[in-house]
Amino acid sequence: MYGSFDQDAAPGRRRRRARAAALTAAVALSVLPGGPAVAGPRPAGPAPVVTRAGLDPSLVAGRGAAVDFVEQEAEHARTNGTVIGPDRSAYTLPSEASGRRAVRLTPGQYVEFTLPAAANAITVRYSIPDSPDGGGSTAPLDVTVGPGRGRTMTLTSQYAWLYNQYPFSNDPDAGLLHPDWWITECSCVPAATTPAPTINKPFRPHHFYDEQRLLLGGTHRAGEVVRLTSPPGSAAAWTVIDLLDSELVSPPHVAPHAVNAVALGADPSGRRDSADALDRAVSLARRTHRTVYLPPGTYQVNRHVIVDDVTIEGAGSWYTTLRGREVTLDTPAPDGSVHTGVGLYGRDPAVGGSSDVHLSGFAIEGDVRERIDTDQVNAIGGALNHSTIDGLYLHHTKVGMWFDGPMTDLRVTDTVIADQIADGLNFHTGVTESSISNSFIRNTGDDGLAMWSERTGNAHNTFDHNTVQSPVLANGIALYGGTDNTVSHNLVADPVREGSAIQVGSRFGAEAFTGHLWITDNTTVRAGTYELNWNIGLGAIWFYALDRSIDADIQVVGDAFLDNTYNAIMLVSDWPVKDQVAITGVAFRDIRVDGTGTSVVSARTAGSASFANIDARNVGAVGVNNCGSFHFTPAGSEFSLTDLGGNDGGWLAPWLLPNTITCNDRPAVVPPPAPAPW
């Protein structure tokens, strides 16, 4: 979603951050109900309510990505539709909405947003019904801005609406994919139960939302009204609008001295396949030590383009798009893929990977509608050493970026990843000295950002100043083993199920955590989800010992856990291994907890942790739920807490220390009030 790109990425990033800072200043006077009016002409519509992750931006200042767009939640806008939610229960439309609320329109109804700053582009996050066969439906959405001529967006559900058990199905009428798995709906294993339980269909509908971008054809001033209308006669019985992002996109970037891909046969109309032309452009650019330039347009690419020792620039992610179909292979590939599709890939790590690849200023639009884990249908993949990725928009692929090591020194910046079937980004197996920063990830079908040390450890990697919103499965940020990694200044909001905001897990065959792990100055919002399989609440941050113990130097410092559905912090081991593993030596310091449905800390494992300067308020149940390893001996819990002082709010009372058993996994949940300034 970024529009200005130079040969030197650093000046481009500086300009984007300057624009973001100016945008923040421009809207700061009008972001909250009751706030002072913006200077200038009187707005044509009601005062805009600008949010970040559905909150007053002041509550998350300094956390997350500094983006060029401004977020407005539909539930704060003017509408003659119906506000739905709040609801944090899985498999509901409100639970997957940003802020857990949205607006439902029937044909003829509208929702209006007042622009808080000048804009020439919008992004609409929406949901419409699926078709009866699960193949997807389309519906119009009329868009008008001020008195100008209206436009119509064609919404689709083709990339939304999954059903059933992992890895899910597009068929709403399908029977259980795994009848031999235990399910919470009947608290049974259906295949082993007599009489067989009744399974309602569609079973477990989820992944309801999609987003669509629109250039408005001109710049509209602050105060003009954007009206989104489900037109009379729409085939969609309802249209749910979650939010609108508005943005002032810079003019297209031009690179007159680069290798122009169009001159080598790439088709910006999208009618002809441009993959071979891109190969020619990459080859020429490497021979002549020049950059490949993709002018404005949509380029059809239906396979991977291999990149190595090359720079590829687009005109900006709003102007240059690589778009492809998912293509069924005649025979499975050696890696198990049965499909291919649009993607830029480094060489396989087995042959050393690629190096010195620099990608910036374009979008990749895939066509992935189902999850097949063996398929390599990701937007960016392979191994990229000493490389950079900046200012991309990645949409409708399986994973935005999946990197297989060994590889080192990759920098991902200022990138948007949205509407993925699985992860947003995964550093997998031996990725070192790499980072993603100032990037925005929304509506992933698995972990938003992950470091997975499967077989070979990751080391010295950083996730910094990213925003992860509404992962519909798993976690916002997940860390599976590794050495000396850092997660800092991120904003994670609205995880839904089978995960939470931040996970530290010894699972999935990951190598051990060694050295240090720093989790510092992050904010989570509306996390601490309900774990359906365990029938308990998780923590906004949760530590999970399954494959092995967790005993590295782990420092959780300066974080804020806001509006937690259940717990703020959880340390847990799985029941079958509870007497073989432990979580020890985790240090929590300088943390604020504003609202828990249940506890500040829930310990369901052997081990220990220390706490210093943890301020907590609006705690729904006992401050510490300490079950340990569930042996309940007179010596107390197998988990010990150390009070290092400065813990305010009464949550860590002396009688709880060091290991008093207070085990109640399912206390009454007290919904906390909305977060407020401390």
Each model region followed by its residue ranges:
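Secretory targeting and sorting signals
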Residues: 1-44
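Extracytoplasmic
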Residues: 45-256
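Acidic Gly/Asp/Thr-rich repetitive segments characteristic of extracellular carbohydrate-active
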Residues: 261-293
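Extracellular beta-strand-rich solenoid/capping regions of secreted or surface-exposed proteins
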Residues: 279, 283-284, 299-313, 321-360, ...
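Extracellular beta-strand solenoid repeats
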Residues: 283, 293, 300, 306, ...
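Short glycine/acidic-rich loop motifs that flank beta-strands on beta-rich extracellular proteins
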Residues: 290, 301-304, 317, 321-327, ...
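Right-handed parallel beta-helix
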Residues: 318, 355-366, 385-398, 407-422, ...
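Leucine-rich solenoid repeat scaffolds
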Residues: 603-666
